């Protein structure tokens, strides 16, 4: 891969996105997110050699929201291994990210770790044996370690905004608790969940944190193994099939990469063996995924030939 080509493609895509009028709708159900500039756009791509191609608002922190679920899943698998799958499934949901319908049919077991119910169950596992502050600190330190940046922090205003308005998540958690899926007090688990979703990162930081998924579980800069190659492959598989909720099929069809979105407008995508990619555009589509983020990634994979399904 030519770094010059990548730099040019990333700059071109940022310029093209700046001209687009179809930006989607900024999330409004979390009041603090509704204040974000809808015209913001950032893109950062980190290659195997550590070269970073960045453009637009790539260094502006934003609320990563559900993208944090990739990292809590990684932590939980490190703690519990395959025992985690007794609490949560691995199938696409086909429903909205905050739907309670399938929990009713499947006795409180969430379909996958990336819908809200699944991520709450994963958070509960991380919390077990810890105080909420300790569990949250572990998650934040893990993110800082992966990104190599201790300045990454939680946006308390966003966390409090979610706590004040997160009634659907409270319903999901209480419903799972009634089936014995959650071990800890619901308010503790939700507190940790709301706070890790409120971690703020830039595209550059997020792309750095995701590098291990692009390189068989290893950080290529340090040579340190974060997870085994098998576990990295399986996390990527879940990102491909479940990472964009009921828009996951469309994302796979158009972009062809494992990816995880968040309602803050971010997407973390993985080009295995090639690059870790983070894009941010706050306007969302009907499924709650970044509209221009997906468009930008589709352009990137086409021009670079990065789709996992072929050129």
From Swiss-Prot:
Catalytically driven reaction(s): L-glutamine + H2O = L-glutamate + NH4(+)
Presence of keyword Hydrolase: yes
GO molecular function, one term: glutaminase activity
Gene Ontology BP annotations: glutamate biosynthetic process; glutamine catabolic process
EC number: 3.5.1.2
InterPro entries: Beta-lactam/transpept-like, Glutaminase
Annotated binding of substrate, by residue: 66, 116, 162, 169, 193, 245, 263
SUPFAM superfamilies according to UniProt: beta-lactamase/transpeptidase-like
Domain of life: Bacteria
Entry keywords, A to Z: Hydrolase
Residues in coiled coil: none
Entry annotated with the keyword Calcium: no
Assembly notes: Homotetramer.
HAMAP family registered for this protein in UniProt: Glutaminase
Record-stated family: Belongs to the glutaminase family.
Protein name as catalogued: Glutaminase
Gene that encodes the chain: glsA
